[in-house]
């Protein structure tokens, strides 16, 4: 596991000892990948005591109509899982009517109509602000991380923002903050259901 093969003169492979890297040198407290509309924030790397938030929207292939989807991880468990793709995978009625739609993604559905075409959809969120800055690997973890993202829900034309934060209160304790705002552009709001 600490060895790799390298080519030398005459395409002869030889084993070289390679020092294993430390995960902490490559992981940052907050990481944002706009090309796939995904954001991850964490307060550490401890398998039992650290907390993590994952946010994603739809940007590219194999995506669902999920708005600002959120998953929570902590204490070694998936605490707020995304529902996945269903029993019959992509060909099932359960996928078409539930697993690919807003209610299965820990997000807000507006007036019961929030949706958009799935597969190869381009409905990403925009990162409005965050702390610490995205992709600064090797820096120490802070006691607070936050991100604020914005999304336009196309069916109801609702402007949505979601602020997520992790607050570390001790070496083994902390909590999440989730503030979701949703408002239709032209008013006439009936309901904004949080699933």
Whereabouts are the PLM-identified features?
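Single conserved hydrophobic/aromatic residue that forms the stacking wall/gate
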Residues: 2-13
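Catalytic and substrate-binding regions of extracellular carbohydrate-active enzymes
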Residues: 11-195
């Amino acid at each position: 596991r600490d060895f790799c093969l390298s080519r030398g003169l005459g395409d002869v492979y030889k084993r070289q000892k390679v020092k294993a890297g430390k995960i902490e040198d490559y992981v940052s407290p907050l990481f944002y990948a706009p090309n796939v509309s995904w954001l991850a924030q964490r307060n550490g790397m401890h398998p039992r005591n650290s907390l993590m938030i994952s946010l994603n929207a739809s940007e590219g292939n194999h995506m669902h109509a999920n708005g600002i989807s959120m998953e929570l991880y902590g204490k070694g468990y998936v605490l707020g899982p995304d529902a996945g793709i269903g029993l019959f995978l992509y060909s099932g009625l359960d996928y078409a009517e539930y697993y690919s739609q807003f209610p299965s993604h820990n997000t807000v559905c507006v007036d019961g109509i929030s949706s958009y075409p799935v597969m190869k959809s381009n409905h990403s969120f925009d990162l409005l602000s965050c702390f610490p800055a995205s992709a600064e690997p090797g820096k120490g973890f802070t006691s607070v991380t936050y991100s604020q993202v914005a999304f336009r829900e196309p069916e109801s034309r609702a402007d949505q923002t979601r602020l997520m934060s992790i607050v570390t209160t001790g070496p083994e304790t902390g909590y999440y903050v989730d503030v979701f705002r949703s408002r239709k552009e032209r008013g006439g709001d009936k309901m904004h259901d949080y699933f």
